[in-house]
C-alpha cells in the first residue's frame, strides 16, 4: 500500500490557522472544555502538565490514548498530543488516532538521543521546540510545520522563553543582512540546511509560525512574548496550576490578542488569584533542564 504523507504547504497552512492564538495543556475533558470556552485555538492533551512531570521525575512518556480520545471527544477545536523525541511508534499511534498535530517534545523523556523523527514522513503536522536558528532550521528540515520556543517548561519562569525568542529573531535579522556569498558559512556555523538559510534571507522570517512556550504564567507574560515577535502562545502548567483556571485562561487569551493594550492587560490581571508557583532558574540542576534534551 502506498504511504501517504502531507505536503509542507498543507501542514504549514494548518499551523498558520492557529496564528495569534493560545494553545493550552489539558489532562482531561473538563480542562479541555474550560480551554475551549476561554477562547483557546487548540489544546494539548497529555497525562501530566510539565510542572507535575518535573516534580514526579522518572521517565515521561506519551499520554494514555484514553486521555487523548477523551479530550478529542470533548472539544471541537484542534487537539495536539506529545510524543517522545525520536519515538516513531508513539508518533504513529497518535497519527492513527487522528490527532490534529503532534508535538515532538523535550518535556517527555527522549527515546532517541541522536535522531529526531523524520516528520516529513508523516501526514499529520508536527510542532517542535527551538532555542536558536540552528535548532529551528534543523527541525524544519526534518519536516516540522510549526515551532515554539523551548523556554523551561513547568517553571512558571518566562526568562528562558524570552531568551530563545530574542535569539531566534536576532539571528534571523543577522541572516537577512548577509550577502549571498556569506550564507554557506552561516549554514555551516548554525548547523542548518543551506536551502533554509537562503529562504530566511529571502523571506526575512521563518517559513513556519513560531509560538512562545515554556514558562508563560500570567497575562503579562503572554503579552510580552507577542511583543517580542511570537506568532502565538502555548501555556502549559500556568493555567491549571493557578488559583482560578477559567479566569486565568480567559485573561491570557485576551492578553495575547490585545497585547499592546496595556490598560486592558492591567484590568485582566486584577484579582486573578495566585499564579502557579515559579522556579528560579539558578535553582535547577543541569540534569533537570528540559530545554537541553534535544539538539
Swiss-Prot record:
It comes from the Bacteria. One of its GO terms (molecular function) is pyridoxal 5'-phosphate synthase (glutamine hydrolysing) activity. The keyword Lyase applies. The active site is at 82 (schiff-base intermediate with d-ribose 5-phosphate). Belongs to the PdxS/SNZ family. This is Pyridoxal 5'-phosphate synthase subunit PdxS. GO terms for biological process: amino acid metabolic process; pyridoxal phosphate biosynthetic process; pyridoxine biosynthetic process. The gene is pdxS. It comes from Listeria innocua serovar 6a (strain ATCC BAA-680 / CLIP 11262). The keyword Lyase applies. Keywords: Lyase, Pyridoxal phosphate, Schiff base. D-ribose 5-phosphate binds at residues 25, 154, 215, 236-237. Catalyzes the formation of pyridoxal 5'-phosphate from ribose 5-phosphate (RBP), glyceraldehyde 3-phosphate (G3P) and ammonia. The ammonia is provided by the PdxT subunit. Can also use ribulose 5-phosphate and dihydroxyacetone phosphate as substrates, resulting from enzyme-catalyzed isomerization of RBP and G3P, respectively. Its EC number is 4.3.3.6. It catalyses: aldehydo-D-ribose 5-phosphate + D-glyceraldehyde 3-phosphate + L-glutamine = pyridoxal 5'-phosphate + L-glutamate + phosphate + 3 H2O + H(+). Pathway: Cofactor biosynthesis; pyridoxal 5'-phosphate biosynthesis. PROSITE patterns: PDXS_SNZ_1, PDXS_SNZ_2. In the presence of PdxT, forms a dodecamer of heterodimers. D-glyceraldehyde 3-phosphate binds at residue 166.
Amino acid at each position: 500500500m502506498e504511504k501517504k504523507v502531507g505536503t509542507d504547504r498543507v501542514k504549514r497552512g494548518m499551523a498558520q490557522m492557529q496564528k495569534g492564538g493560545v494553545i493550552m495543556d489539558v489532562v482531561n475533558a473538563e480542562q479541555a472544555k474550560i480551554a475551549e470556552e476561554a477562547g483557546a485555538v487548540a489544546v494539548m492533551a497529555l497525562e501530566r502538565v510539565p510542572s507535575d512531570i518535573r516534580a514526579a521525575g522518572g521517565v515521561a512518556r506519551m499520554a494514555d490514548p484514553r486521555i487523548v480520545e477523551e479530550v478529542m471527544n470533548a472539544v471541537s477545536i484542534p487537539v495536539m498530543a506529545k510524543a517522545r523525541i525520536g519515538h516513531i511508534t508513539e508518533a504513529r499511534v497518535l497519527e492513527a488516532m487522528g490527532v490534529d498535530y503532534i508535538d515532538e517534545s523535550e518535556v517527555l523523556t527522549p527515546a532517541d538521543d541522536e535522531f529526531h523523527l523524520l516528520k516529513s514522513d508523516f501526514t499529520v503536522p508536527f510542532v517542535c521546540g527551538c532555542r536558536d536558528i540552528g535548532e529551528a532550521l534543523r527541525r524544519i528540515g526534518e519536516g516540522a510545520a510549526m515551532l515554539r520556543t523551548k523556554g523551561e517548561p513547568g517553571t512558571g519562569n518566562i526568562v528562558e522563553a524570552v531568551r530563545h525568542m530574542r535569539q531566534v529573531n536576532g539571528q534571523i535579522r543577522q541572516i537577512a543582512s548577509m550577502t549571498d556569498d556569506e550564507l554557506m558559512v552561516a549554514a555551516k556555523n548554525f548547523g542548518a540546511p543551506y536551502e533554509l538559510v537562503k529562504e530566511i534571507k529571502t523571506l526575512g522570517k521563518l517559513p513556519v509560525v513560531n509560538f512562545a512556550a515554556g514558562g508563560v504564567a500570567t497575562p503579562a507574560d503572554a503579552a510580552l512574548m507577542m511583543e517580542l515577535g511570537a506568532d502565538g502562545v502555548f501555556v502549559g502548567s500556568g493555567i491549571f496550576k493557578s488559583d482560578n483556571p477559567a479566569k486565568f485562561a480567559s485573561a491570557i487569551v485576551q492578553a495575547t490578542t490585545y497585547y499592546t493594550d496595556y490598560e486592558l492587560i492591567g484590568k485582566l490581571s486584577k484579582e486573578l488569584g495566585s499564579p502557579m508557583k515559579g522556579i528560579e532558574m539558578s535553582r535547577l540542576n543541569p540534569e533537570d533542564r528540559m530545554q537541553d534534551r534535544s539538539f
